[in-house]
């Protein structure tokens, strides 16, 4: 039997948290335990497990691949096996391509495709932003913060959720903090992208607090 330290380093066991690296999922499919949805209208989202040799955890990632420039749609991949109020939620994001946006984000306290919180990192506009999506409309919780998000490279996006306080980190550096009381109840967590962004995700981590 492998010692506990090795199990932790391989991502096979994590103390009091959930770590998903997609490496045991089936290529070309949505991973088990995840569902696909979308805010607004446009071409259907296309999420699937894909091979990427640059992945932080080799060899697979979860990718959003459909392209619908100008539709202002927000494809979502929701992890259905958790519902929580407070947590640290993080993911590694690789913004591969996009003419209008190169963007990826995490969502929390997700109720349905029209109601959730969202933090995003934009490699085209080089900023980080946080929103409340309510009744299908994005409500900006503060002005986006300029921050260098390297395109076609892996960046860590994390949100620390404690009651009404939300802190957003990029590559372990805190970038912004806001307070909002609209959605106080527990909800699901997941991944988000927008419009024509081709975005890869890996090493999704959720630690309840």
Please describe what each predicted stretch is.
Residues 27, 59, 64-134:
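Secretory/extracellular carbohydrate-interaction modules
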Residues 10-40, 202:
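Extracellular carbohydrate-recognition regions
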Residues 22, 89-91, 152-168:
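Short tryptophan-centered beta-strand motifs in secreted/extracellular beta-sheet-rich domains
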Residues 134-156:
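Short, aromatic/His-centered strand-loop micro-motif at the edge of beta-sheets
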Residues 169-190:
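Short, solvent-exposed beta-strand-to-loop segments that form ligand-recognition rims
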Residues 16-21, 183-209:
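Ligand-recognition surfaces built from glycine- and aromatic
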Residues 75-82, 143-149, 190:
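Beta-strand-rich interaction surfaces with strong enrichment in secreted/lumenal proteins
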Residues 29-63, 70:
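Extracellular glycan-recognition surfaces and repeat-rich motifs
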